[in-house]
Amino acid sequence: MANTLEQLKLYTTIVADTGDIEAIKRYQPEDATTNPSLILKAAQIPEYESLIDNAIDWAKSQSANLAQQLDDASDKLAVNIGVEILKLVPGRISTEVDARLSFDKEQSIAKAHKLVRLYQEAGVDKSRILIKLASTWEGICAARELEKEGINCNLTLLFSFAQARACAEAGAYLISPFVGRILDWYKKDTGKDYDAVNDPGVVSVTEIYNYYKQHGFNTVVMGASFRNIGEIIELAGCDRLTIGPSLLEELANSQIDITPKLVAATSTVAAEAPLTEAQFRWDFNQDPMAVDKLAEGIRNFAIDQGKLEVMLTAKLAN
């Protein structure tokens, strides 16, 4: 009998949620995703020292201004790690725009252009890149413009149906609804435990997936942020699932019979009129879990970006 991971790959594209080259070699995913927290973790792996040195040297060659050097080194390091990962996966790498730009459409677009340019200078075509943006109204509007330019986007930190609907209406290439973080909130709020079938994160992704397929949206649904393999198994059949190394290992070492739980609708109905900004903000605000988790996610990514910059500042000073 094939292991659980091998079975899952029959129904769902598996993506590695890591910047760790060794983990990617081991589990052979189709794509990989990174974020500021994963870049910070990857930057502390000894094998990446040369990538950091290259980013520092490049940043110093671009500007004499320390703030600009720091910005450049951070972007270049994320791209350097992405380039290494792309040597191992046949598909795409997701690289995230600075979380501190989550409420600035124009600066998010400018940062996306810079990341794409750095990848292209490293010989990577934009067809292999997904630009990750937080699923704020501003992030979604930035994605709408980038998609028109042929720059595909991954809308992340997605916790609500309102966010998912707005992303699809904007023509986003892909969304990353966060399964485990939704579960975390409900467990803390209710004091209850949930089995995988009734897991609020699983229920949310299932609702989004069904809505997209029923209304003919092409936006890819990629479940993310898992707490256990039960959540993953209940989402077999989802377009993509991005999974961290520890859960990939658990899937590879187990033999649970997998059947597809999410199945695309065979007929579609006309989509509703797109959400206005006012409707989006109201609908989103009505979901206290989503409001809490989006704000927390942006803050935490910004904190880890700051930690990375402290590390890079010390190296720039040498």
Curated annotation (Swiss-Prot):
Matches recorded under Gene3D superfamilies: Aldolase class I (3.20.20.70)
S-S pairs: none
Swiss-Prot/TrEMBL catalytic activity: D-sedoheptulose 7-phosphate + D-glyceraldehyde 3-phosphate = D-erythrose 4-phosphate + beta-D-fructose 6-phosphate
PROSITE patterns found in the cross-reference section: TRANSALDOLASE_1 (PS01054), TRANSALDOLASE_2 (PS00958)
Gene Ontology cellular-component annotations: cytosol
Keywords, alphabetical: Cytoplasm, Pentose shunt, Schiff base, Transferase
EC number: 2.2.1.2
Catalytic residues in the record: K132 (schiff-base intermediate with substrate)
GO term, biological process aspect, one: pentose-phosphate shunt
Subcellular location: Cytoplasm
Main function: Transaldolase is important for the balance of metabolites in the pentose-phosphate pathway.
Record note on quaternary structure: Homodimer.
Sequence similarity: Belongs to the transaldolase family. Type 1 subfamily.
Name of the featured protein: Transaldolase
Native species: Shewanella baltica (strain OS155 / ATCC BAA-1091)
